[in-house]
C-alpha cells in the first residue's frame, strides 16, 4: 500500500508519503540527524536512498532528556562545520525527539532552511512528524522553546516499525486513539474491533494513514494552533506536567499522554460532557496496549499550579481539551478550579478507575 497526502496551509504545501521509502533527490548539501539506536537500525537503508552531492551525518544522544539547547547547539555546530548554506537540507531520522530538534534547528539555522521528516516510531509517524510544530524542553516544562517550521516533505515507512519495541509501539497507539476520540467515532469503534499490531502491516498502515489524514485536515484548517488544532493537545495538558514531574525518565511521551487523556476524561465526566461508559471504553482501549491510565499525584494544588506554564493558557486562564462523547472535543477555559482539584485529588489514590 502506498498513499500520498498533502498539507496545504497559508505558508506551505508539502506531501506526506506513506509506504516504502522512495529515493530522495536533492541538489545541495544534506545533513542527516539521528541518534545511535536509530542509526544502527536504519541509517544504511536511508543513506542508500538519498541522492545528493554531499551527505553528512550528525548523531545526537537518545532520549527526551536530551531534547534541550545543548543538543540544538551541537546540531548547529555540525551544520556550520560542514558549511551548510540556505539551500542545504536537514533530514530528521528518528522519533518525535529527533523530529522536534531537527525542525527547530533547521528553522533557526541561517534564519531557516528546509528539512525533511523520516519518522521511525509509530508516535512520530501518526502525529509528531506532521504539522510543523517544533520545540525543545527546559527546566520550566516541555516544548516551551520552539517555533512553527513546516517540513519540505514527510516520508512514513511503516516497515521501519518492525524493529520498534512493544512499549514504543504502545506509546504510538495512544496518539492514534487520541485522534479517534477527538474526531472520529467510527475510527474509534474500528480500533475496538481490531488489534493494531506490527505483524499486521495492512491494518496498521490503514490506521496510520487515517490518523495522518485527520491531522492533515486539522493542520490545513489551523496551522498556527489558533483554534481547532488545539484539540490535538487532548491528553497533553496533563501529560506534559507528568513528564516534567518525572524528569522525562519514567514515561514515554505517549504513555504520559495516555494518563493525561484519562485525567481529561475524568474531568469531562465531572462536567457532564462524557459518560462513565465512554470514559471506561477509552481506558479499556488504552489498557489493551499496556498503556498506563493512572499517575499518583502527591499534591493536587502543586500539580494545578503548573498549568500556568501551558502554552494554551492565556491571561491566566487554563485551556482544557475535553472530550464530549466519542468523536467530538471541546476547548474550555472556564472550568472551575475546584472541579479540577477534585479530579486531581482522585488521582492521589491508589487507583484512578
From Swiss-Prot:
Which Pfam families does this one have?
A: DHQ_synthase, DHQS_C
Q: Which residues bind NAD(+)?
A: 62-67, 96-100, 120-121, 133, 142
Q: Which InterPro entries does the record cross-reference, listed alphabetically?
A: Dehydroquinate_synthase (IPR050071), DHQ_synth_AroB (IPR016037), DHQ_synth_fam (IPR030963), DHQS/DOIS_N (IPR030960), DHQS_C (IPR056179)
Query: Is Lyase set as a keyword in this record?
Result: yes
Q: Which residues bind Zn(2+)?
A: 175, 236, 253
Q: What is its EC number?
A: 4.2.3.4
Q: Name one GO molecular function term.
A: nucleotide binding
Name the Gene3D superfamilies on file. 3.40.50.1970, Dehydroquinate synthase-like - alpha domain
Where does the record place it? Cytoplasm
The lineage's top-level taxon is Bacteria
Q: Which SUPFAM superfamilies match?
A: Dehydroquinate synthase-like
Q: What is its biological role?
A: Catalyzes the conversion of 3-deoxy-D-arabino-heptulosonate 7-phosphate (DAHP) to dehydroquinate (DHQ).
| Protein family membership | Belongs to the sugar phosphate cyclases superfamily. Dehydroquinate synthase family.
The protein, known as: 3-dehydroquinate synthase
Recorded name of the encoding gene: aroB
Amino acid at each position: 500500500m502506498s498513499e500520498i497526502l498533502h498539507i496545504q496551509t497559508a505558508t506551505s504545501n508539502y506531501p506526506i508519503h506513506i509506504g516504502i521509502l522512495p529515493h530522495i533527490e536533492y541538489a545541495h548539501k544534506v545533513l542527516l540527524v539521528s541518534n545511535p539506536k536509530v542509526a544502527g537500525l536504519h541509517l544504511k537503508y536511508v543513506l542508500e536512498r538519498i541522492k545528493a552531492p554531499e551527505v553528512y551525518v550528525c548523531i545526537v544522544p537518545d532520549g527526551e532528556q536530551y531534547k534541550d539547547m545543548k543538543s540544538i547547539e551541537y546540531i548547529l555546530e555540525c551544520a556550520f562545520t560542514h558549511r551548510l548554506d540556505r539551500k542545504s537540507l536537514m533530514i530528521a531520522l528518528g522519533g518525535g525527539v529527533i523530529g522536534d530538534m531537527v525542525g527547530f534547528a533547521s528553522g533557526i539555522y541561517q534564519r531557516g532552511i528546509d528539512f525533511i521528516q523520516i519518522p521511525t516510531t509509530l508516535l512520530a509517524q501518526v502525529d509528531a512528524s506532521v504539522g510543523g510544530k517544533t520545540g525543545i524542553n527546559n527546566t520550566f516544562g516541555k516544548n516551551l522553546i520552539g517555533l512553527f517550521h513546516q517540513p519540505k516533505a514527510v516520508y512514513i515507512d511503516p516497515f521501519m516499525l518492525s524493529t520498534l519495541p512493544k512499549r514504543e509501539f504502545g506509546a504510538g497507539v495512544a496518539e492514534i486513539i487520541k485522534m479517534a476520540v477527538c474526531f472520529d467515532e467510527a475510527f474509534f469503534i474500528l480500533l475496538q474491533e481490531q488489534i493494531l499490531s506490527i505483524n499486521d502491516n495492512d491494518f496498521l498502515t490503514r490506521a496510520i494513514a487515517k490518523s495522518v489524514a485527520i491531522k492533515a485536515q486539522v493542520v490545513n484548517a489551523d496551522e498556527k494552533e489558533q483554534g481547532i488544532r488545539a484539540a490535538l493537545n487532548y491528553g497533553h495538558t496533563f501529560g506534559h506536567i507528568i513528564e516534567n514531574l518525572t524528569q522525562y525518565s519514567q514515561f514515554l511521551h505517549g504513555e504520559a499522554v495516555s494518563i493525561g487523556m484519562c485525567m481529561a476524561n475524568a474531568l469531562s465526566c465531572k462536567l457532564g460532557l462524557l459518560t462513565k461508559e465512554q470514559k471506561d471504553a477509552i481506558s479499556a482501549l488504552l489498557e489493551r496496549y499496556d498503556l498506563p491510565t493512572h499517575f499518583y499525584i502527591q499534591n493536587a494544588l502543586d500539580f494545578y499550579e503548573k498549568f500556568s506554564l501551558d502554552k494554551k493558557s492565556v491571561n491566566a486562564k487554563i485551556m482544557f481539551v475535553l472530550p464530549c462523547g466519542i468523536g467530538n472535543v471541546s476547548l474550555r477555559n472556564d472550568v472551575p478550579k475546584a472541579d479540577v482539584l477534585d479530579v486531581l485529588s482522585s488521582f492521589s489514590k491508589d487507583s484512578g478507575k
